[in-house]
Amino acid sequence: MQSTTRVLVIMRHAKAEPSAPSDHERVLTDRGTADADEAGAWLGAAGATPGRALVSDAARARGTWAALAGGAGWDVEAEYDASLYAAGPDTALDLLRETDEAVGTLVVVGHNPTMAYVAQMLDDGDGDAAAVAAMSEGFPTSAVAVFAVEGPWADLEMGGARLTAFHVGHG
């Protein structure tokens, strides 16, 4: 059986305003919008085009997706998922596993600490040395971790992806 390499992009939302009527309603700052746009340009230049975009339904994640997609030049409709807003690592991983097998590239935009935990736990330790070193220094706002995933999304496990790139958007 031939293995298919898929691409998984995990992103922490961009810089958001410190307050709003509720945490869920916090919007991006101007810097956050610029950072997400730059991260999108970086991903677009790398040739990434998502077949699925799974995004938290929080305002700051929605804004991050809009700027990211704009910067990359993507015309992809995001799937906004309320459960990703407060998901722990196990729940987030379950959401990734639900991705249709026809999807070659999956982009996920969510929140810390979950995005950082999932990225660190998926890493098989055999990835790009510079990317691994950069990710080990932290997962700030607008951080993007790119992984190669062998096999079906449904079989994705901790330690089951190779980190190929890490970038922090700076607009």
What is the predicted function of each stretch?
Residues L93-T99:
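Short, surface-exposed amphipathic charged segments that create phosphate/polyanion-binding patches used
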Residues Q2-T91, D123-A129, F139:
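Active-site-proximal alpha-helix that buttresses catalytic centers in soluble enzyme cores
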Residues L8, T105-V107, V144:
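Residue-level preference for the first positions of well-ordered beta-strands
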Residues D123-R162, V168:
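Domain-level recognition of soluble alpha/beta enzyme cores
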Residues K15, A58-R60, P113, G151, ...:
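Short, glycine/serine-rich, charged loops/turns that create anion-binding
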Residues A46-A48, T99-G104:
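Glycine-rich phosphate-binding loop signature in dinucleotide/nucleotide-binding domains
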